């Protein structure tokens, strides 16, 4: 029995593995690439939760005896009526971080700083071999900067500013980001709920 991370995103897998290490999941962790032939996951849900559940249940069809963890996450900008939301990864087309950043900055070009509020959300679904799902979520609030700042991270990290840290995600170390990020908060919540959930399994 193992824990499969239902993602091909190397950055996301590295981040999740680091966070899983902190909550002591006693299972070997593998990525989708390591389990071979998997069906295509169509992320056509209208919410992060729908997409996360769709990922774990799709992979469960080919790995019914394993635990499967999937995250669906994205950034919602208030001045853009919640965009990019569930379309965060493909906001400007096919998974192009720079194009996505450029599109957000362009759309916010005339929006004053105080109205550039945004939120990063992560919903994590953990699917058990018995077919039940544990759902947790995390949210971090911030602002969209007027230009990119920082060299680390991925996705929208260079333009997502967190006031409590006085930095963008891309200006933070991995450990700083993992402590306060949406995915980090969701995994911390998973760590709290997991022991009780596993007893019920």
Swiss-Prot record:
GO terms for cellular component: cytosol. Pyrophosphatase that catalyzes the hydrolysis of nucleoside triphosphates to their monophosphate derivatives, with a high preference for the non-canonical purine nucleotides XTP (xanthosine triphosphate), dITP (deoxyinosine triphosphate) and ITP. Seems to function as a house-cleaning enzyme that removes non-canonical purine nucleotides from the nucleotide pool, thus preventing their incorporation into DNA/RNA and avoiding chromosomal lesions. Keywords: Hydrolase, Magnesium, Metal-binding, Nucleotide metabolism, Nucleotide-binding. It comes from Leuconostoc mesenteroides subsp. mesenteroides (strain ATCC 8293 / DSM 20343 / BCRC 11652 / CCM 1803 / JCM 6124 / NCDO 523 / NBRC 100496 / NCIMB 8023 / NCTC 12954 / NRRL B-1118 / 37Y). It is an enzyme of class 3 (hydrolase). This is dITP/XTP pyrophosphatase. It comes from the Bacteria. It catalyses: XTP + H2O = XMP + diphosphate + H(+); dITP + H2O = dIMP + diphosphate + H(+); ITP + H2O = IMP + diphosphate + H(+). InterPro entries: dITP/XTP_pyrophosphatase (IPR020922), ITPase-like_fam (IPR029001), RdgB/HAM1 (IPR002637).
């Amino acid at each position: 029995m193992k824990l499969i991370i239902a993602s091909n995103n190397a950055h996301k897998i590295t981040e999740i593995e680091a966070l899983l290490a902190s909550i002591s999941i006693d299972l070997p962790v593998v990525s989708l690439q390591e389990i071979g032939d998997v069906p295509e996951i169509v992320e056509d849900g209208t919410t992060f939760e729908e997409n996360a559940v769709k990922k774990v249940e799709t992979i469960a069809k080919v790995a019914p005896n394993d635990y499967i963890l999937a995250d669906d996450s994205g950034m919602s900008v208030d001045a853009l009526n919640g965009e990019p939301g569930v379309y965060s990864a493909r906001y400007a087309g096919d998974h192009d971080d720079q194009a996505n950043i450029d599109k957000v900055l362009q759309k916010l070009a005339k929006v004053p700083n105080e109205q550039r509020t945004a939120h990063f959300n992560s919903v994590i679904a953990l699917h058990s071999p018995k077919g039940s799902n544990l759902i947790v979520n995390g949210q971090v609030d911030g602002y969209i900067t007027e230009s990119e700042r920082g060299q680390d991270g991925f996705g929208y990290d260079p333009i997502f500013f967190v006031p409590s840290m006085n930095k963008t995600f891309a200006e933070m170390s991995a450990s700083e980001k993992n402590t306060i990020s949406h995915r980090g908060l969701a995994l911390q919540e998973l760590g709290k709920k997991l022991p009780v959930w596993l007893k019920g399994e």
